Amino acid sequence: MKEDGDFQSRRSFIFTPGTRPELLSKAFESGADIVCLELEDGVAPDDKTKARQNVVTLLKSAPENESIELVVRVNSLRNRFGLDDLIAFLDTALPLTIMLPKVESEDEVKIIDDLFLESNQQINLQVIIETN
């Protein structure tokens, strides 16, 4: 949401795997409304730690562009990778939009909100409810 309370239209997303930081500049030039740094399904389990480190580095150096929303799609909170993702971003103190996939209950959203609130960090959440 924009600061004035109006909703921002989003027409397109482009996902960039955290394992491929060299693709970020192409993603920003794509014309997409949202550039999503992918830590979830687009990253193999053996590459999760390196992808997370890459994304933290990218967030610290990403170009500012008010017309593009930068989002990080983390792993589900119901596995170790998701918890590790959140801990990494809690430690950065960067403004952040988190895409939370595979949400099964409101408790998952509350946990994230509470963690970042306790750390005095503002985040935006994009909650994805998925079914099989």
Protein language model features and the residues they cover:
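Short, Gly/Pro- and small/polar-rich lid/capping loops
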Residues: 1
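Conserved alpha/beta-domain cores
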Residues: 4-132
